[in-house]
């Protein structure tokens, strides 16, 4: 319907070159930035809409299609590492990506001490149990700053809605540019620490007996399975 198509166009104009004298804000290195929580979510979801607009709704308007495609490509490339930090906001992608994503399951923490996971120092510093390959995190603030700490979850959180539009944009890229699967992906994971161990001590002892206190410790960070 022409009315909804026009609303679609107005939305994308606001996110690209501006509409009605207004335009989306940008980080210094060029990311279209709506607000702090999930800045990459908003940008990559709009990138998906831009791909749809370029390939379907406005395919007969060469100038608009080019503008929307360029916006979508640059936004996705920003997420992949084409930014002033030279860092990918997609976990496990590229030579440099964030290390402290806010995702409890992949952290493998068996207690509530997980604030230093992904850090190189601190009482609880250790790597995540699992690399959450392909997940998009929240993203930078308006200055382009990013804090790679689990506790700063406005930057590091992984959420379903953060990844929905991003995944759709990836599908649009594959449809548009093609691609192939990596036969060596994902790599085989090995436990990063001892998963199962015993702790025992003498609880009490007398001339005729010795009472042992023993604990079987399960620090596995894997899904339920037969051991």
Predicted features and spans:
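Glycan-recognition and catalytic regions of carbohydrate-active enzymes
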Residues: 182-205
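Aromatic (Trp/Tyr) and acidic
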Residues: 1-21, 33-188
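Short beta-strand elements of extracellular/lumenal beta-sandwich folds
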Residues: 206-225
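Helix-rich interaction surfaces within compact, conserved domain-sized segments
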Residues: 24-26
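Short linear capping/connector segments at secondary-structure termini
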Residues: 28-32
